[in-house]
Swiss-Prot record:
It holds the Pfam family Zip. The chain crosses the membrane at residues 61-81, 87-107, 128-148, 207-227, 236-256, 268-288, 297-317, 336-356. It is found in: Cell membrane. GO terms for biological process: zinc ion transmembrane transport. One of its GO terms (molecular function) is zinc ion transmembrane transporter activity. It is a multi-pass membrane protein. This is Zinc transporter 2. Belongs to the ZIP transporter (TC 2.A.5) family. InterPro entries: ZIP (IPR003689). Keywords: Cell membrane, Glycoprotein, Ion transport, Membrane, Signal, Transmembrane, Transmembrane helix, Transport, Zinc, Zinc transport.
Length: 358
């Protein structure tokens, strides 16, 4: 039995890595052929992209649909199937490496280059300053979440904390059985998606929590919406989808154990709220590109990419790498070395991708 589980875990992990590399190739191959100049550029001498080109807008709309459908499917999937813990644990670390590499090598580089073109006589590091601002803004959203949880903690029953055990994937129960008291006590301190929604004592608290939790997802979507080429849009899509889908799966697993009444409706409702945030950001980015052009569009792009850098770094470090998916029962593949390898692989994928992006 143990050997069979190990084989299945190994198969899932190999499939995950193959899918990641295939998606990378697809992101660049589908990003635009050499003859699709009407979508990626306006044909001017400077080679400036046409942000209102029909092909570019269509690609962004496809990205909107894919990230919404993928996140929603991931959120409700635990209701229909059982996910492998090793796949989720290492896959989340892989997504963290991808997020970190994308922020540092793609978004920050693009923002810095655009600011250099906009302000050639200024040496001030605007891109890096905005990255810090994005990091702090995301931390502020997390502080708002912590405030709501702390305010509602005194009004919730002690038993409510026993169901909370996810920190981007940390489970406090297995196969429907309650966890041990120490695990439940530790889970009470978690500020995770599922546990915080579970402890929200009023509808207003729940709405505020969902808004705060989806704050960075909206800016992630804006990174797709303001992309200058189809290749950039598809690349941002698969980067964001990795994080969103893994987080949605982990949230769905915890909700099934914490909310036994009408579990499918609970999973669908929370997954829908989590899934719709990034498409909202994509829509905002599309509207920005549709109403601006030239120098104004460059400023918006530079500021958006700078803020997105800080948000991606915060999500990578504080939500994916430091917390990740931690199953209650030990998993053979979930070791420090395994997690390091997954993170290095995620960063390496972006490093290789950037060879064709420079």
């Amino acid at each position: 039995m143990a050997g069979g589980r190990g084989a299945r875990a190994s198969l899932h992990l190999h499939l995950a890595w193959l899918c990641a590399f295939a998606t990378t190739a697809w992101a660049h191959g589908g990003g635009g052929g050499g003859g699709d100049s009407d979508a990626d550029a306006d044909g001017g001498g400077e080679g400036k992209p046409d942000l209102r080109a029909r092909g570019l807008v269509a690609a962004k709309l496809w990205c909107l649909a894919v990230v919404f459908a993928g996140t929603l499917a991931g959120g409700v999937s635990p209701y229909f199937m059982r996910w492998n813990d090793a796949f989720l644990a290492l896959g989340t670390q892989f997504a963290g490496g991808v997020f970190l590499g994308t922020a540092m090598m793609h978004f920050l580089a693009d923002a810095n280059e655009t600011f250099a073109d906009l302000l050639p006589g200024t040496a001030y590091p605007f891109a890096f300053m905005l990255a810090c601002a994005g990091y702090v803004l995301t931390m502020l959203a997390d502080c708002a979440i912590s405030f709501v949880v702390a305010r509602g903690g005194g009004r919730t029953e002690p038993a409510a904390a026993a169901g909370a055990g996810l920190e981007e994937g940390k489970l406090s129960s297995t196969n429907g059985n309650a966890s041990d008291p120490p695990a439940a006590d530790a889970a009470a301190q978690d500020h995770s998606v599922a546990s915080m929604l579970r402890n929200a004592s009023t509808l207003g608290d729940s709405v505020l929590l969902i808004a705060a939790l989806c704050f960075h997802s909206v800016f992630e979507g804006i990174a797709i919406g303001v992309a200058e080429t189809k290749a950039d849009a598809w690349k941002a899509l698969w980067t964001i989808s990795l994080h969103k889908i893994f987080a949605a799966i982990a949230m769905g697993i915890a909700l099934l154990r914490m909310l036994p009444d009408r579990p499918f409706l609970s999973c669908f409702g929370y997954a829908f709220a989590f899934a719709v945030s990034s498409p909202v950001g994509v829509g905002i980015g599309i509207v920005i590109d549709a109403t601006t052009q030239g120098r104004v569009a460059d400023w918006i792009f530079a500021v958006s990419m700078g803020l997105a850098t800080g948000i991606f770094i915060y999500v990578s470090i504080n939500h994916l790498l430091s917390k990740g998916y931690t199953p209650l029962r030990p998993v053979a593949a979930d070791t420090p070395a395994g997690r390091l390898l997954a993170v290095v692989l995620g960063v390496a994928v972006i490093a290789v991708v950037m060879i064709w992006d420079t």
